Every structure is written in C-alpha cells, then in structure tokens.
Amino acid sequence: MKYSQNKSLNTFEIEYKIANKSVKIKSSGKMGVITKELKLKEPAIQSNNIYYLKNHGDSRIIIGTMKQQIQGVLAGFCIELKLVGLGFVVHKVGNTLVLDVGYSHYRSCLIPKEVVVKLEGSQIILYSINKEKVTTFASLLKTFKKINMYKGTGILGINEKIKLKKGKVR
C-alpha cells in the first residue's frame, strides 16, 4: 500500500507491507529515507483486501511509528544537551565525541552514522531523521556524567529543570 502527499514544501511518501506477523514501513521525504520492520503480537487477518489486527496495541504501535517517520523525513529530530560544571569540555575528533567531564580520564564514544553532531561551546546539538537513534545516543551521553542533585552539575537536556536538594545543616 502506498500513500503520498505532495505540496510545495512538504513532500513525503509512505509504503507499507503487512505480512502474517510483521509490518514493514518505509517512509521517504526531502530529508531522507527511513525503513523499519515491526513484529506483531497477533497475526493480521485479511478479509476483502482489508487487514484487521486483533491486538489494539499493535495498531497503536504502527500509527505511532508512521507519525515519527513522517516527522523525521519532513523536519527531523533535534536534541540539545548542555554541560553544566566547572571545566566540562566536549570535543569532536573525527567520528568520535570526547568528553572531559571531571574524571581522571576522557570519556569517548563513536557517533552513529545517522546522527549529526554540532558543538557550540558547552552545548551539544544532536540531529537525525531517526528519532530512535538520536534519543538513544543522547541517553548514552547523559550516562557519562549523571546529574548531581546537590550542585546541579552534569549533562542536562536544554529544557531540563533540576530541583536541588538541601545539603547538610551544621
């Protein structure tokens, strides 16, 4: 099955194939192409060229995945992280992100092919058309320096608010 929308700015196309216990969804647009295969909990039932799904959760997963893919191929997903702390620095060396976040050694990780990284001072801007890849990479970076609830330092999302705990009263 194929669905497409053509306007001057937004152009996208969705193709999907329903097999017995899986659905393959392919979305393409101006930003790129995303392909994903979903496993169904119950087999799909076909009657007069109409597919029925027994499990309500399966249909919600398919609709949610299509929404994410449409948004990804039209605009993409952007996540901004900030390094809060004295002397916290981030560098991009080739295809590797190197973080100096207060340990005796540097923390480094490979940047996935689908994710574009831009550094502005102490901010890390991650961009991709695949929401799953960019959020997974952002959560990986956040694990390198967890938030200190007493000082408010660590790797934070740009809109993340922290309620500081009280220290010891002497």
Curated annotation (Swiss-Prot):
Chief place of localization: mitochondrion
Keyword Ribosomal protein appears in the UniProt entry: yes
Pfam families attached to this UniProt entry: Ribosomal_L6
Swiss-Prot/TrEMBL GO biological process terms: translation
Matches recorded under InterPro entries: Ribosomal_uL6-like, Ribosomal_uL6-like_a/b-dom_sf, Ribosomal_uL6_a/b-dom, Ribosomal_uL6_bac-type
Keywords: Mitochondrion, Ribonucleoprotein, Ribosomal protein
Cell compartments where the protein resides: Mitochondrion
A GO MF label: rRNA binding
Gene Ontology, cellular component aspect: mitochondrial large ribosomal subunit
Family: Belongs to the universal ribosomal protein uL6 family.
Designated name of the protein: Large ribosomal subunit protein uL6m
Annotated organism of origin: Dictyostelium discoideum (Social amoeba)
